[in-house]
Regions:
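A beta-strand edge to alpha-helix "cap/lid" segment located at domain peripheries
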Residues: 1, 54-131
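Short, low-complexity N-terminal intrinsically disordered segments enriched in polar/charged residues
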Residues: 1-24, 126-131
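Short, mixed-charge, low-aromatic patches
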Residues: 4-14, 37-40, 55-59, 80-82
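Hydrophobic pocket/interface hotspot
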Residues: 6-9, 20-21, 25, 29, ...
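Short glycine/serine/threonine-biased micro-segments
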Residues: 14, 33, 89
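Flexible, active-site-adjacent loop/turn segments at secondary-structure boundaries
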Residues: 20, 37, 41, 92, ...
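A solvent-exposed, acidic/Ser-Thr-rich amphipathic alpha-helical stretch
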Residues: 26-75
Length: 131
């Protein structure tokens, strides 16, 4: 795995295109979103983890718009620092820094742990309730 390849995997998330990103995620991925907010949890499949992006899409019309700020890659692991620069339905600027630690099998993400600003994510959903 190379830094350029990891950057390319995340590139589509800048415009909210999660489908291109999820093409690089294993069907049986093991992904934990850390924290105490509505997206936190342990997801044991691509479909389950993709649900977090679906949920975000209901309150962030243009998607999370995640931009890679820094990354470290060693062998089949990567640490990716991202920043969401999205705007919520109610106009809230969702400027959320996050870090994701990944494990790859070849070019496929098989494990992930994401750390987000729990207070900001909670505020996002409190101010933009999903019906």
């Amino acid at each position: 795995m190379t830094p350029d390849h990891v950057r390319q995997i995340f590139k589509s998330l800048e415009t909210g295109d999660s489908a291109a990103f999820f093409a690089h995620v294993a069907d049986d991925v093991d992904w934990t979103v850390m924290g105490t907010h509505p997206l936190a949890g342990h997801y044991r499949s691509k479909a389950a983890y993709a649900g977090t992006f679906t949920k975000l899409g209901k309150v962030l019309p243009q998607g999370a718009q995640l931009h890679v700020e820094h990354l470290l890659v060693k062998d089949d692991e990567a640490a990716v620092e991202l920043r969401s620069l999205a705007t919520a339905i109610n106009g809230l600027r969702f400027d959320n820094p996050c870090c994701t630690v990944l494990a790859f099998d070849g070019e496929t993400i098989v494990r992930g742990r994401s750390y987000l600003d729990s207070a900001l994510v909670a505020r996002l959903f409190e101010e933009n309730p999903i019906a």
